[in-house]
Amino acid sequence: MQEKVLVLDIDGTLTNSKKEITEATKQGIWNILQHGHKVILASGRPTPGMRKCEEELELKKYGGYLLSFNGARIVECKTGEVIYQRTLPLSIVPGLYEFAKANGCGLITYQGEGVISAFEPDKYVQLEARINGIPIQVVDDFVSYVDFDINKCLMTAPEEIAPELEKQLQEKYSDVASIYRSEPYFIEIMPKDVNKATSLDHMLEGMGLTRENAICCGDGYNDISMIEYAGTGVAMGNAQPAVKEAADYITGTNDEDGLVEVIDKFIMKPEKE
């Protein structure tokens, strides 16, 4: 049996449009875990925002990994240990603050179990906190307050202007950060050269496995790197067009148990042959 590593984005992939993991998806994941394969949840979410999915899938019992902040932190589920971490240079924070202020954007980072916001939360910052089930703390002086290690910042803007702002940020900070949108209104500011693919490569090497063992499934822009990297890259039926173009296979949507199709086709069926 060739060991497989199933790598799953959360929002729009593992969860349906109601932000739920269906029973069929849970059973499929438990089945492959019991057959000796591995599961990694890979998300732009902060680590606390992944805990509910970790608990629902019983990954502390079965084993698994949380690749959070788009790959800037990796946690082993059984031990809770942080096994890999990358941080942003704090020197970038004042410039991000001024840029966000000038363009009317939201700007947040993460501390402990919550979100730290530079301004009164807009609807996109509120959405980020709600999705992750974590509180928002608005601070008076964001630049002075952020004096701790940060895995990422998130800038929020209406989707009509976000692409242009993303481009400007990339031009300004490409030497120190990786910048890309995970949603039409979320601009991720990450440590340079950190994405889901680079962190996954680090993990697989530690496991003694290669990209050929990986089946990566996603729907958003921040999933493209790992979908292109994987031996088998899968786009959900609800994925952005650019994600589908990058994929080897397009499965059903997240409301059609698309992951069950992937598990059957690429893991369980080959095992029987």
Please name every model-derived segment:
Residues 4-18:
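Asp-based phosphoryl-transfer active-site loop
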Residues 99, 103-217, 225:
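Conserved acidic, metal-coordinating active-site core of Asp-based
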Residues 1-8, 27-30, 34, 171:
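Non-catalytic pre-domain segments flanking phosphatase-related domains
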Residues 1-5, 22, 188-273:
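Mg2+-dependent phosphoryl-transfer enzymes with acidic/Ser/Thr/Gly-rich catalytic loops
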Residues 57, 62, 70, 173-175, ...:
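Short, structured coil segments at secondary-structure junctions
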Residues 36-40, 64, 152, 212-213, ...:
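Short active-site oxyanion
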Residues 32, 43, 70, 153, ...:
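Residue-level signal for inorganic ion chemistry
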Residues 23-123:
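Active-site phosphate-binding/coordination module
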